[in-house]
């Protein structure tokens, strides 16, 4: 389907583009920089010229049924074309968002995205910093507020408080007026404190359930043994929410929820506001050019990262 394009002299739709594509299920070694067609627009879609695309640790395992596939589901860029009859987005808008997981992603010069999933990006930060927000920050928002029902004044325990999702959860819970208890270890203990946690438990030194006072909400970002042990620290009527794996069933007086993050324009708008106010700070670990996507995906598997690994597509 055709669309409304940028004004004459500003942009001409190319027939092809560079895109990173996964050609097999063996990880970063099966990534290739290919020349492919620029995607056509469906109803309600916009074409975004990608400036930066963030990547996630396990995402190369997601598209095994539709290879070759373009990875990266977080984009920051500029709208260059909109579908006929589409309202709400204009050519030249700087936007960011979480793209659908069941189609090609943003590790390319252009990506077609349903306009309802895009929002104006935070203009106080760079495109790579904008791209670092959607997946992790939406996961944090939905875990705390949509599934966790966190209210001001409540106590929340965040497992992995300085990690990819945890760093946003710590900042959002603090901004919301909750009492934030975080778990971390090593250098991440100091980072969790700097993010605004009221208390930080060094799990390399103590078991969290031995030292934490009862909490209203546990938000788990990593799964495993800490999640299994979490019901014991919840107050009656407490909530256990995990974005990592199905939580254990605790006493009938608590609720346990596992969720998968969903795109949300409304939530992105609020995240943009918080970033531009300086109340939510995205972290970027490293930036790689599109041609070095293999190195970027190898970096995302390494330990010791602080923040997102991002592909820079256009300056």
Cite the ranges covered by each PLM segment.
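NAD(P)H dinucleotide-binding glycine-rich loop of Rossmann-like/cofactor-binding domains
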Residues: 61, 98-160
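Conserved beta-strand positions in the Rossmann-like core of class I SAM-dependent methyltransferases
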Residues: 80, 181-183, 241
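A short acidic, Gly/Pro-enriched loop at the edge of an enzyme's catalytic core
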Residues: 210-217
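Glycine-rich beta-strand-centered segment in the early N-terminal region that forms part
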Residues: 37-54, 62-102
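Glycine-rich phosphate-binding loop and adjacent beta-alpha segment
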Residues: 103, 221-283, 312-315
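C-terminal hydrophobic helical "lid"/dimerization subdomain
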Residues: 3-15, 268-315
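Mid-domain Rossmann-like dinucleotide-binding core that forms the NAD(H)/NADP(H) cofactor-binding site
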Residues: 2, 131-205
């Amino acid at each position: 389907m055709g669309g409304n394009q940028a004004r004459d002299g500003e942009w001409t739709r190319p027939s092809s583009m560079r895109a990173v594509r996964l050609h097999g299920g063996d990880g970063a070694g099966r990534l290739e920089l290919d020349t492919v067609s620029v995607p056509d627009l469906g109803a309600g879609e916009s074409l975004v010229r990608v400036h930066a695309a963030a990547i996630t640790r396990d995402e190369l395992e997601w598209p095994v049924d539709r290879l070759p596939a373009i990875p990266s589901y977080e984009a920051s860029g500029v709208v260059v074309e909109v579908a006929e009859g589409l309202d709400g987005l204009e050519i030249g808008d700087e936007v960011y968002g979480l793209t659908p997981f069941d189609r090609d992603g943003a590790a390319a010069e252009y990506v077609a995205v349903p306009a309802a999933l895009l929002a104006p990006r935070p203009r106080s930060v760079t495109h790579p910093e904008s791209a670092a927000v959607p997946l992790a920050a939406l996961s944090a928002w939905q875990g705390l507020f949509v599934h966790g029902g966190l209210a001001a004044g409540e106590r929340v325990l965040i497992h992995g408080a300085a990690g990819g999702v945890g760093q946003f959860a710590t900042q959002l819970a603090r901004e919301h007026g909750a009492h934030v208890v975080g778990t971390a270890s090593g250098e991440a203990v100091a980072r969790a404190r700097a993010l605004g946690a009221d208390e930080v438990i060094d799990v390399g030194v103590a078991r969290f359930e031995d030292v934490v006072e009862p909490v209203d909400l546990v938000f788990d970002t990593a799964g495993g043994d800490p999640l299994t042990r979490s019901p014991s620290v919840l107050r009656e009527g407490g909530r256990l929410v995990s974005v990592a794996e199905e939580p254990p069933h605790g006493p009938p007086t608590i609720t346990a929820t596992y969720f998968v993050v969903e795109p949300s324009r409304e939530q992105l708008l609020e995240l943009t506001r918080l970033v531009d106010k300086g109340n939510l700070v995205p972290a970027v670990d490293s930036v790689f050019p599109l041609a070095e996507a293999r190195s970027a995906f190898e970096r995302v598997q390494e330990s010791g990262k602080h923040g997102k690994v991002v592909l820079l597509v256009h300056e």
